[in-house]
Each structure stands twice: as C-alpha cells, then as structure tokens.
Design a protein with these regions (language model features):
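Active-site signature of cysteine proteases
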Residues: 36-203
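Papain-like cysteine protease catalytic cores
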Residues: 1-56
C-alpha cells in the first residue's frame, strides 16, 4: 500500500471476509474461551440443523448484505471512496457522506431496530471506559483503533443525545460495560459505520 508496511490489523470488512471464507460457530460450541489446542469442530448444530462453520456463517451474515460508510471532507460526498487508513490495507471502498449524515444514518437504523457497527477513535481525552462516557474531544482526524456496536439511544439531563454502545471490555463500569457516546463525539471520531443495506435504507 503505497510503500507502507502492511498492518496486521484490519477493519470491519476484514471480519466479514474472514467469516465468509473461514466460517463462524455459535458461542456455546466451545466449552472454554481458549480452545486452539483441541481439534476444531467440523459441524455446528443450531436449532436442530447441522452446518459447517462456513454454512453457519452464511446463514446468519452474508457479506453482500452489508455496506460501509465513512466521512472524508477531502473526497467527494455521495461517492464510493477508498478510505485512507493504514488498517484499510485491503483497499475496501466506503460510501462517503457528510458528518451530519453519519448521525442521521445511525438514527434511521436504530429507529428500524437495526444495530450499527461503529469503528473509530477512542485514544483521546473524551473517551473513558471507566466512566462509561465518550463525550467532548478535540480530535482533528480520527484514528482507527476500536469497534463497538451501537444498540440504542439515551438523553442526557441537559437534553443532548447519546448513543448506547455495546463494548467488549467486560462489565466493570457504571453501565455494566456499556459506553454512552455523544452525537458530537460520533461526528468527530467516527472512522466508519458498517450496517446492513436494509438498515441504511430504513427498512
């Protein structure tokens, strides 16, 4: 990628591609969270049906069902662009929208009961997992360093809108591991959103 060393990390589309190629299994397929010393299962059983890991992945998540959205003011809006982040070494394309549209897209998806995968910057003074809040920040261009799932909305006592985010760092904060992100933070610290095409269209 332009002479730069390829990173070992990826973005949301990297997970979709891995799931399509390698498959996934339900959480309870493994008796323990660390299981790479024993043979991997050839079959997955769910709701009385038998699947290979690839078949199971395709039954719950088809990569073609998803789209990626970003906001880059240096590129034309309403067009598919290659997001210029080191983690996008696969050179995937994203629909480029204005920052205000990011909020509108999330609100529309949540209104129709769809979660949204949020990818963005948390290495700044506005993010605190300990307090469960992501708010005011002065980040100029976000770095790609974390993913969370947007699952709901909340109102601050001052009337401001916050997004309820499901995080993966355990439950040790005042909100049982959830993080409440202000729409101001979402505007300035979002690298990408991943959601189904149905969610994007508000179906």
């Amino acid at each position: 990628m332009d002479g730069r060393k390829q990173r070992q990390r990826g973005m949301g589309h990297s997970l979709l591609r891995l799931m399509a190629n390698k498959g996934i299994v339900p959480f309870d397929t493994y008796p323990d969270s660390t299981h790479d010393q024993l043979p991997l299962p050839q079959w997955v059983f769910m709701l009385g049906a038998r699947y290979t890991p690839q078949e199971f992945a395709h039954s719950v998540c088809g990569p073609e069902e998803y789209m990626a959205v970003t906001s880059d003011p240096t590129q034309p809006y309403g067009k598919m662009i290659v997001a210029d982040y080191p983690d996008n070494w696969e050179r995937e394309t994203f629909l480029n929208v204005p920052q205000d549209s990011l909020v509108a897209i999330v609100l529309r998806a949540l209104h129709h009961r769809h979660p949204v995968c949020w990818e963005g910057d948390i290495n700044n003074s506005g993010f605190s997992f300990r307090s469960g809040i992501a708010d005011h920040t002065t980040s100029s261009r976000p770095d790609d360093d974390h993913c969370m799932t947007i699952i709901g909305l909340a109102r601050h006592p001052d009337g401001r809108l916050f997004f309820k985010m499901k995080n993966s760092w355990g439950t040790d904060n005042p909100y049982g591991g959830m993080v409440y992100m202000s729409q101001e933070y979402l505007r300035c610290c979002t690298v990408a959103l991943y959601l189904t095409r149905e969610a994007y269209l508000g179906k």
